[in-house]
UniProtKB/Swiss-Prot annotation:
This is 23 kDa structural polyprotein. Structural component of the virion.
């Protein structure tokens, strides 16, 4: 996880 947000879990 780059940020750990609900929008950027593992998509980044």
């Amino acid at each position: 996880m780059e940020f750990g947000n609900l929008t950027n879990l593992d998509v980044a």
